[in-house]
């Protein structure tokens, strides 16, 4: 095996390595590592957060960036935000729909 898995927690790293040992690819390992990291250290990432990835597909000339950050809720439109010069961090309008799961799906596809 000529792969490497690195994460902030040994259990997350072990999960990624195990995926590679079972025949998964780097994307599979990255997703598994990220999911486990969200369980063992939820303050660092997880299902309720966003996902950003820099991915290089074998044979491509350059990597691409996946931005799976959250988006506004379905009832939010520009007119509902126009009265704010700044939105307080503890205001409901400052919360986005988490993008991590959508990012895992996009990476897998």
Describe each PLM feature range:
Residues 1-22, 26-109:
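Noncatalytic scaffold domains of N-terminal-nucleophile
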């Amino acid at each position: 095996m000529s792969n490497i898995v690195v994460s902030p927690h040994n259990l997350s790293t072990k999960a990624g390595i195990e995926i590679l040992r079972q025949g998964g690819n780097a994307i599979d390992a990255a997703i598994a590592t990220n999911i486990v990291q969200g369980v063992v250290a939820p303050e660092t990432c997880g299902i309720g957060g966003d996902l950003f990835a820099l991915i290089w597909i074998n044979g491509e000339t350059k990597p691409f960036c996946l931005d799976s950050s959250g988006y506004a809720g379905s009832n939010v439109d520009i007119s509902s935000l126009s009265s704010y010069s700044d939105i307080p961090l503890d205001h409901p309008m400052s919360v986005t729909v988490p993008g991590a799961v959508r990012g895992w799906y996009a990476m897998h596809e």
